[in-house]
């Protein structure tokens, strides 16, 4: 009798355990605990489960605690998302699309505002992730207002913005402002990650598609596509008065991005100027810009400071492909004597190919006002129609090292080099007068297929011993 009793008891316990495991698994899948669900067909009176989802992003944001993933079901949400709570270390709060469903946050119904108007706002929060969303169609008409797709501000940290598509954010004011992704370190920020997003077709006025500004220490901008915008693609800014202290972006990496067709030409804030950088460091420090593909912008990559007496310092611009940009390929130094400059930076192993497409005499490499103690080496430069390899129309140029570069020699084409306002129409006269490029060569680098922008070198390329 006792034997059968224990067998029966064991069976009951097993059933209870299995039921508990099933219920726990079902709860995790459906929203009780780690997951909340939102759907256009839901109700904020629901429980937030998969079967009974919430209706609004706002309600989900109020309910989401550390470790919660808010699964957003397919549809268009005509509302803004204000992230209300922080996650914790190892337990972020995540807002993302469910599986591969198409989730759109639309600004079409957002009232025209007078100040910052973001579709997603993260202020003074930490351990937050935004992923897999399309953020679009927000417009402002006032010069005092700024339309923003995703806006991070205050002392936020450990923020991940990944796999989103941002488009159609715009200002219609001639001197207005708009951003796709804007991170403003008004307080102390760290660990900001912007990865694998597409940011396109923005009307930006005087602002930038993707910007980090102020007191930000530690960031990654990687794998993004930034294209077809009417101002700067990616901007890293300091010294604008955004933060009370440490007012400059620093200690970050910008890598593996594809940035193209960003131009201010025709933008009412600039008129007929070609002044939009694909990637721009304006007063940042200790930043790596590497392995990016940057083409068909006004300026490929630029590093300087727009503020007198300030510098873009310790910037490493390496292993980038920079081609067919309107004004110049890579630029350092301020655009006039009222600006700051570039110091202690490295430009190495880049391809600068047929930039200066508008004949603006920016060449492939441009040194402007106040450049000092920079190293320019192991690059391959192919001139455009202007035939200018290096432009340097300022004498404020000291301690810069230029050597071990390859200048592409082409049949029946001469090159031009400029240094401290003096122009040289032969490689030998340029080297003799400036003492630059003593171990550099003027030769055909033998690209594998330059017509297809494949700049890998043939095995017998004379460039190999110089740059490798």
UniProtKB/Swiss-Prot annotation:
Its main location: secreted. SUPFAM superfamilies: Pectin lyase-like (SSF51126). Keywords: Repeat, Secreted, Signal. The keyword Secreted applies. One of its GO terms (cellular component) is extracellular region. Disulfide bonds: none annotated. Residues 1-27 form the signal peptide. The keyword Repeat applies. PbH1 repeats lie at residues 125-154, 156-185, 189-214, 216-238, 249-283, 284-305, 312-334, 397-420. Gene3D superfamilies: Single-stranded right-handed beta-helix, Pectin lyase-like (2.160.20.10). GO terms for molecular function: carbon-oxygen lyase activity, acting on polysaccharides. It is found in: Secreted. InterPro entries: Carb-bd_sugar_hydrolysis-dom (IPR006633), PbH1 (IPR006626), Pectin_lyas_fold (IPR012334), Pectin_lyase_fold/virulence (IPR011050), Pel9A-like_beta_helix (IPR053868), Polysaccharide_Lyase_9 (IPR052052). This is Uncharacterized protein YwoF.
């Amino acid at each position: 009798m006792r034997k059968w009793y224990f067998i029966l008891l064991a069976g009951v316990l097993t059933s209870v355990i299995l039921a508990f495991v099933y219920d726990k698994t079902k709860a995790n899948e459906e929203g009780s605990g780690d997951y909340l669900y939102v759907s256009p067909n839901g109700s904020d009176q629901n429980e937030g489960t998969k079967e009974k989802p919430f209706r609004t992003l706002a309600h989900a944001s109020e309910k989401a605690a550390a470790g919660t993933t808010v699964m957003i079901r397919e549809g268009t949400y005509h509302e803004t998302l204000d992230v209300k709570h922080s996650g914790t270390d190892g337990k972020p709060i995540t807002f993302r699309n469910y599986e591969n469903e198409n989730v759109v946050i639309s600004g079409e119904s957002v009232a025209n505002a007078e100040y910052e108007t973001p579709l997603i706002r993260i202020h003074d929060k930490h351990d937050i992730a935004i992923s897999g969303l399309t953020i679009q169609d927000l417009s402002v008409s006032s010069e005092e207002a700024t339309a923003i797709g995703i806006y991070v501000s205050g002392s936020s940290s450990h923020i991940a913005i990944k796999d989103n598509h941002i488009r159609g954010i715009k200002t219609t004011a001639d001197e207005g402002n708009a951003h796709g992704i804007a991170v403003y370190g008004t307080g102390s920020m760290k660990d900001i990650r912007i990865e694998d997003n597409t940011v396109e077709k923005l009307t930006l006025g005087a602002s930038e598609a993707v910007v980090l500004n102020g007191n930000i220490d530690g960031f990654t901008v990687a794998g993004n596509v930034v294209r077809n915008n009417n101002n700067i693609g990616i901007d890293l800014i300091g010294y604008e008065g955004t933060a009370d202290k440490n007012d400059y972006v620093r200690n970050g990496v910008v890598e593996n991005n594809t940035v193209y067709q960003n131009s201010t030409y025709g933008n009412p804030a600039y008129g007929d100027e070609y002044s939009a950088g694909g990637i721009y460091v304006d007063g940042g420090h200790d930043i790596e810009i590497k392995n990016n593909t940057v083409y068909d912008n006004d300026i490929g990559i630029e590093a300087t400071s727009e503020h007198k007496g300030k510098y873009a310092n310790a910037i490493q611009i390496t292993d980038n492909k920079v081609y067919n940009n309107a004004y110049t390929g890579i630029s350092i130094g301020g655009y006039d004597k009222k600006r700051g400059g570039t110091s202690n930076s490295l430009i190495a192993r880049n391809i600068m190919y047929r930039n200066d497409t508008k004949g603006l005499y920016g060449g492939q490499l441009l040194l402007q006002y106040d450049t000092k103690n920079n190293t320019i080496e192991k690059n391959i430069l192919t001139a455009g129609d202007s035939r200018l390899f290096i432009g340097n129309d300022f004498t404020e140029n000291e301690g810069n090292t230029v050597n071990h570069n390859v200048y592409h020699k082409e049949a029946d084409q001469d090159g031009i080099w400029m240094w401290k306002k003096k122009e040289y129409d032969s490689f030998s006269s340029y080297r003799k007068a400036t003492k630059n490029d003593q171990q550099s060569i003027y030769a055909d680098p033998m690209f594998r297929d330059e017509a297809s922008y494949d700049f890998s070198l043939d095995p017998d390329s004379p460039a190999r011993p110089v740059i490798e």
